[in-house]
């Protein structure tokens, strides 16, 4: 007789094992209709799983975060069902739940076209309207293998052979005649899967290896209600308008061409933004007492073998050779910084030594993964490495956390997610070292009152790391900052310092990046601001324009004042209507347009208009410059008011 305690404190006693769905029905018909799964003693279970003993139960609906993930998992399997209806010859590989959606990779000779995706979506709706129950069965590993072998699902057989213990039970989910394996949970009935949209297809490879079979990936999104789906699709349209590749072209910021895939040609205005970011970060480096250095782009392969990068990271490293020597084009800056540290004998009094570099790095990313500024092969890291004693680690991490948050808040990012990535299976260093490194990071985050999640097994091969992920105005996640402890690399490269007892000790090395890749961060900013950069970042901050030729000399005089004040300004003396000029510079997202007519000359002032169409009225030039300099110097996000 299991006694079930519901979240609200209600206790229910049953004479026999009971499922969450049956309990929901007992509570109310509405609860039964909305029950998609449950937390049983804080563990996610299917709504149809039987509860055998006294338990705590929290019923999950499609409105909950966990419920949405379950709904999307079920929609993904509904997609599989529809694929097999339309193309029985398709071979199913793996499907995954991703942020706000799902995807399934399939092996199908027929290349999917837009009309095929429309047909798939229609088939999914037809199947969902049948309101069939989704059936869960546990079978032995051997039984599962026989089922998939009989169905010709060679990839499922491979997954069973390579990834699943032969002594475990395998959960199979039946969507009518379509069967797939999954950890679950799934919705109890297909009626939960009505509010979805198939979005796009792409090419991928079995096990992410381009030497394996080419697959087609189908992406979709799914939501609990039709209104949620419509709102999400509407936000996607807005995101599409903000595509950094499109705006980058409109504003003439940069380009990428075939002859240099994943490498950026910065144009004048784009390079201004790049340099402003560098200047901002440099100001932080000075405040936090960093030394700036520059290390070579190419270093002999033997050094990368010594560091462990070659054995752990070789597929991402570009190489070149000269005079019978093989060189690696650096994918990261850390080995070079250790070489600089090693050029002198350092005392404990010299520590912490904070070494920063805007390092130009190259990584051999697959061509199919390249995406504008967001995924490139050549990028600039705002990289730093701190050499310190074990006793100094927590203070240094504290300082880095403070600096990161100051930088992110300057750009207007308030929602910051933090993950602590722990030791991967393939790593260097012993477990004792990893235990200490992970504990130091966790303790510092806790002491700072920062909520974080563990990302188990996602650390670098040489140390655990804290990852800072920014949520933009569309709640898209951008992982930018990292703070990473490394007790191994300094030892491998024979770095040491002399302690107060005149002994040689290996320093702790902290890897730190704030923006990460400057190229990628500019892409993020373009989309976050829709090209409306804060004035301090805007390539052109002010445009001066005349109404007629009578004001040309006055405009030129005012331009000289702006130049003297180090404000990035341009003049527009073209013989065009003033409305035309205003529209053109508004489209260029110039923060301030200064209009000069006869009235302005008479009063010795200028009329100021913002790119948002706001007329600020007339200002004396010196007064405007003073306000503008304050806005720029304080890196304000807001503009001058009347």
Swiss-Prot record:
It comes from Baumannia cicadellinicola subsp. Homalodisca coagulata. It holds the Pfam family tRNA_SAD. Its main location: cytoplasm. GO terms for biological process: threonyl-tRNA aminoacylation. GO terms for molecular function: ATP binding; metal ion binding; threonine-tRNA ligase activity; tRNA binding. Binds 1 zinc ion per subunit. Its EC number is 6.1.1.3. It is found in: Cytoplasm. It is an enzyme of class 6 (ligase). Belongs to the class-II aminoacyl-tRNA synthetase family. Zn(2+) binds at residues 334, 385, 511. Residues 1-61 form the TGS domain. This is Threonine--tRNA ligase. Residues 243-534 are annotated as: Catalytic. The keyword Aminoacyl-tRNA synthetase applies. Keywords: Aminoacyl-tRNA synthetase, ATP-binding, Cytoplasm, Ligase, Metal-binding, Nucleotide-binding, Protein biosynthesis, RNA-binding, tRNA-binding, Zinc. Homodimer. It catalyses: tRNA(Thr) + L-threonine + ATP = L-threonyl-tRNA(Thr) + AMP + diphosphate + H(+). Its cofactor is Zn(2+). Catalyzes the attachment of threonine to tRNA(Thr) in a two-step reaction: L-threonine is first activated by ATP to form Thr-AMP and then transferred to the acceptor end of tRNA(Thr). Also edits incorrectly charged L-seryl-tRNA(Thr). InterPro entries: aa-tRNA-synt_IIb, aa-tRNA-synth_II, aa-tRNA-synth_II/BPL/LPL, Anticodon-bd, Anticodon-bd_dom_sf, Beta-grasp_dom_sf, TGS, TGS-like. It comes from the Bacteria. The keyword Disulfide bond does not apply.
């Amino acid at each position: 007789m299991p006694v079930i305690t519901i979240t609200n404190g209600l206790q229910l006693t049953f004479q026999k094992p009971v499922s969450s769905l049956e309990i929901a029905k007992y509570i109310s018909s509405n609860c039964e209709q909305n029950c998609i799964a449950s937390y049983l003693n804080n563990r996610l279970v299917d709504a149809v799983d039987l509860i055998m003993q006294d338990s705590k139960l929290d019923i999950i609906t499609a409105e909950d975060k966990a419920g949405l993930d379950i709904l999307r998992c079920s929609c993904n399997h509904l997609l599989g069902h529809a694929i097999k209806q339309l193309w029985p010859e398709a071979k199913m590989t793996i499907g995954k739940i991703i942020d706000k959606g799902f995807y399934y990779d399939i092996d199908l000779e027929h290349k999917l076209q837009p009309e095929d995706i429309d047909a798939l979506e229609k088939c999914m709706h037809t199947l969902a309207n049948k309101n069939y129950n989704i059936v869960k069965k546990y079978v032995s590993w051997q039984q599962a293998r026989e089922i998939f072998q009989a169905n010709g699902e060679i990839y499922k057989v491979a997954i069973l052979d390579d990834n699943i213990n032969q002594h475990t039970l395998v959960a199979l989910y039946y969507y009518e005649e379509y069967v797939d394996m999954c950890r679950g949970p799934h919705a109890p009935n297909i009626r939960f899967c009505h509010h979805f949209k198939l979005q796009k297809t792409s090419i991928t490879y079995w096990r992410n290896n381009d030497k394996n079979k080419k697959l087609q990936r189908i992406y979709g999104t799914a939501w609990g209600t039709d209104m949620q789906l419509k709102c999400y699709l509407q936000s996607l349209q807005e995101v599409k308008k903000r595509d950094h590749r499109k705006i980058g072209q409109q504003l003439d910021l940069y380009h990428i061409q075939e002859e240099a895939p994943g490498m950026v040609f910065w144009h004048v205005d784009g390079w201004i933004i790049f340099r402003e970011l560098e200047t901002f970060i440099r100001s932080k480096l000075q405040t936090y007492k960093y030394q700036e250095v520059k290390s070579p782009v190419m270093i002999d392969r033997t050094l990368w073998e010594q560091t462990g990068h070659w054995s752990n990271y070789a597929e991402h490293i570009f190489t070149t050779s000269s005079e019978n020597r093989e060189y690696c084009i650096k994918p990261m800056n850390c080995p070079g910084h250790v070489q600089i540290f090693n050029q002198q004998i350092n005392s404990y009094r010299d520590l912490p030594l904070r070494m920063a570099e805007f390092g130009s790095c190259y990584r051999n990313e697959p061509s199919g993964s390249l995406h504008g500024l967001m995924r490139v092969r050549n990028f600039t890291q705002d990289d730093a490495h701190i050499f310190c004693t074990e006793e100094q680690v927590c203070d240094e991490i504290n300082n880095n956390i403070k600096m990161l948050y100051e930088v992110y808040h300057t750009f207007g990012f308030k929602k910051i997610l933090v993950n602590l990535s722990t030791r991967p299976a393939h790593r260097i260093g012993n477990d004792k070292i990893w235990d200490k490194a992970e504990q130091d990071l966790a303790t510092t985050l806790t002491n700072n009152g920062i909520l974080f999640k563990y990302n188990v097994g996602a650390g670098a091969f040489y140390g655990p790391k804290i990852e800072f992920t920014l949520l933009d105005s569309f709640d898209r996640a951008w992982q930018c900052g990292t703070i990473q402890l490394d007790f191994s690399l300094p030892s491998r490269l024979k770095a040491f310092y002399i302690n107060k007892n005149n002994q040689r000790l290996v320093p702790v090395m902290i890897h730190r990046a704030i923006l990460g890749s400057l190229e990628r961060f500019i892409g993020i900013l373009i989309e976050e601001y829709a090209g409306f950069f804060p004035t301090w970042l805007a390539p052109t901050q002010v445009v001066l324009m005349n109404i007629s030729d009578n004001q040309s000399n006055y405009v030129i005089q005012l331009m000289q004042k702006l130049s003297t004040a180090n404000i990035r300004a341009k003049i527009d003396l073209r013989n065009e209507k003033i409305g035309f000029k205003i529209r053109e510079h508004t489209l260029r997202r110039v923060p301030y347009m200064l209009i000069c007519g006869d009235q302005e000359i008479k009063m010795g002032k200028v009329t100021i208009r913002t790119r948002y169409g706001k007329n600020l009225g007339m200002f004396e030039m010196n007064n405007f410059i003073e306000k503008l300099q304050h806005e720029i110097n304080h890196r304000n996000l807001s503009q001058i008011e009347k």
